[in-house]
């Protein structure tokens, strides 16, 4: 079957939820038996989001093959079964970098390099490569129609209709239809102007998804259809909902998938959304409620921890427990003390970089250890747990990470100088290496200790999880920490790197160097998060032993 392309654009305002809408549509098409993948085209000039501030951009989502990508790829993996790779996300910076590399190499035979055709051709080639082997590929174009940064991408997707055939391309435009309380009606004019802007580029949308805080009346949808030159059945009303996992059913109920399949001449069965119905049931029918404190440094933007927040919710689904997440600034723990941690059913310290707020995270790990509160540390959350244990249990008072104190007496966490990448090739780094793309990245296997809690949770001896870190436990000081009572529950396959630690003198204290949140999904959950949420509920009920 020839690959079909659905291009998803957004208008009127940013942050409309293009990624969620596109992923929900992909979930329906996948439920019809189609082989679906997704792509995100980002208009910023950074090569990738790896060195961008989480407070500006949100989290960096890491794929199995080690790509540092946009957080929307996390949504994609949570909604469809297809695993994302570095092919599924690229930026303006990445495209220009590749075109300039080819120009320096002489690939263009002395031609004058221009946005059209050289940049647009590179974009089209990447879209086609990313969609190879799939029935349908949904391509989300970042930004808002009208932004100057998005123009090369919009021109490229316009040209795709001629490249692969109009019968294999579908343009889906997401807009805002605001409600004005003063007049008591929804206003369609912003949508009309957004489509007009798209038409000026040469793209006629095939369908519109209209975001609003309420159902858009049929007469207003007919008006939008008339002025925007689309069939009425192709104007989809997408109202605000209390759970993003309800959106696939909402789109299906309006026949968007039928309309698209008919357009592509795809003969496939009706979508079976029973798995999503089960997710919605689990979310809506908890048998208890817990409050988990997440102690981090980027808490002013929850999207900086998007996958962790979603993974905690998934853990709640599988444990039939509603999870309330209390975001706590680690600097507040430093200034106000551990009193602000009282009343929590569990504590999670997520990943992060830099010295700011790290002592607050160490205090949180100590509070959880001493008060027998369930603790889950992720990446830096494992490192601070190791530092805390070394200082306060193993009598290594000056213990620290060389990231924060290069000359400390006990560098229990230190820079990894070499490791094997996902292809088995040796990677070497020093303190002077570039920050971008120089970490231990992607899926890595890990052997679990037979007597560990994590072995029981995972139910197997070897697991594969995704990494994103530059520092690791210092093996030269490890024996003293183990002798003080800390258990190494997981190691890399070559036995050189510590991947998971546990405290056997604590009812539920687990910390891992990898990022389990990247592989958690609403349908399957994740054993670490499900176990963590259950431990929080048992702690609340006084049942945690």
From Swiss-Prot:
UTP binds at residues 14, 187-192, 223. The keyword Transmembrane does not apply. ATP binds at residues 15-20, 72, 239-241. Its EC number is 6.3.4.2. It holds the Pfam family CTP_synth_N. Homotetramer. This is CTP synthase. It comes from Proteus mirabilis (strain HI4320). The gene is pyrG.
């Amino acid at each position: 079957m020839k690959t079909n392309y659905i291009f998803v654009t957004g208008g009127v305002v940013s942050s409309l939820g293009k990624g969620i809408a596109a992923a929900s549509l992909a979930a329906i098409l996948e439920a019809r038996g189609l082989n679906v993948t997704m792509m995100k085209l980002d208009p910023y000039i950074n090569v990738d989001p790896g060195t961008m501030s989480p407070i500006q951009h949100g989290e960096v989502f890491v794929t199995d093959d080690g790509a540092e990508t946009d957080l929307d790829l996390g949504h994609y993996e949570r909604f469809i079964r297809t695993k994302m790779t570095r092919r599924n996300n690229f930026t303006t910076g990445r495209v220009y970098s590749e075109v300039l590399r080819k120009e320096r190499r002489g690939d263009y035979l002395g031609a004058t390099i221009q946005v059209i055709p050289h940049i647009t051709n590179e974009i089209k080639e990447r879209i086609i490569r990313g969609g190879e082997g799939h029935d349908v590929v949904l391509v989300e174009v970042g930004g808002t129609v009208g932004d100057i940064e998005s123009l090369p991408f919009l021109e490229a997707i316009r040209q795709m209709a001629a490249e692969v055939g109009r019968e294999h391309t579908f343009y889906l435009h997401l807009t805002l239809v605001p409600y004005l309380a003063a007049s008591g009606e929804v206003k369609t004019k912003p949508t009309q102007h957004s489509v007009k802007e798209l038409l000026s580029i040469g793209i006629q949308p095939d369908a519109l998804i209209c975001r609003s805080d309420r159902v858009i009346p049929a007469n207003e949808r007919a008006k939008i259809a008339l002025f925007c030159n689309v069939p009425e059945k192709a104007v989809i009303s997408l109202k605000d909902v209390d759970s993003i996992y309800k959106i696939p059913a909402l789109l299906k109920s309006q026949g968007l998938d039928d309309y698209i399949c008919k357009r592509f001449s795809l003969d496939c069965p009706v979508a079976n959304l029973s798995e999503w119905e089960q997710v919605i049931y689990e979310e809506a029918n908890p048998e208890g409620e817990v409050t988990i404190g997440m102690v981090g440094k980027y808490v002013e933007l929850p999207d900086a921890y998007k996958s962790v927040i979603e993974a905690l919710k998934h853990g709640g689904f599988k444990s039939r427990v509603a999870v309330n997440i209390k975001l706590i600034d680690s600097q507040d723990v430093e200034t106000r003390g551990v009193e602000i941690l009282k009343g929590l059913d569990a504590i999670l310290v997520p990943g992060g970089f830099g010295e700011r707020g790290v002592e607050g995270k160490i205090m949180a790990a100590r509070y959880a250890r001493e008060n027998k509160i369930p603790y889950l540390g992720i990446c830096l959350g494992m490192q601070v747990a190791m530092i805390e244990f070394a200082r306060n249990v193993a009598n290594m008072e000056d213990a620290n990470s060389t990231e924060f104190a290069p000359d400390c007496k006990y560098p229990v966490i230190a820079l990894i100088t070499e490791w094997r990448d996902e292809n088995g090739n040796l990677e070497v780094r020093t303190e002077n290496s570039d920050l971008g793309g120089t970490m231990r990245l992607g899926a890595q296997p890990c052997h679990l200790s037979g007597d560990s809690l994590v072995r029981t949770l995972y139910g197997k001896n070897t697991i594969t999880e995704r990494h994103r870190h530059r520092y690791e436990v210092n093996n030269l000081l490890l024996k003293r920490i183990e002798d003080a009572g800390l258990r190494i529950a997981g190691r890399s396959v070559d036995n050189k790197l510590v991947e998971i630690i546990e405290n056997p003198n604590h009812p539920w204290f687990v910390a891992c160097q990898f990022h389990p949140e990247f592989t958690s999904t609403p349908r399957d959950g994740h054993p670490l998060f499900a176990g963590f949420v259950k431990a929080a509920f048992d702690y609340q009920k006084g049942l945690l032993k």
